[in-house]
Amino acid sequence: MLTDRFQSYVERHGLFSRDDRILLTVSGGVDSMVLLSLMASLGYRFGVAHCNFQLRGAESDEDEVIVAREAARYGVPCYNRRFDTAAEMERTGESMEMAARRLRYAWFDALSREHGYT
């Protein structure tokens, strides 16, 4: 079963323990939604962070809604943040990937410190 394989992998590689509070970053794509389900079904302590970079119009907004709904269904905290990525790219001259990476990593770091996530 997938949950058993996931649990075994986490333990074998020492990724985190049941005592850790994990900040799980969830895009709304299949892989991160499966990870959300696995973490919840195995009883890990975690919160969900979702970035809306506002680059795909309504699809970006739909992902935000889906992630928030699933986090609520599992009873875990959900933090959503919208970034004006296009304006940030214009301001800094960075590529879309670099601007989005810098924005999300800074936010994830701040969330982790503020809420005690590892």
Stretches found by the model and what they are:
Residues 1-118:
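Core alpha/beta nucleotide-donor-binding catalytic domains of modification enzymes
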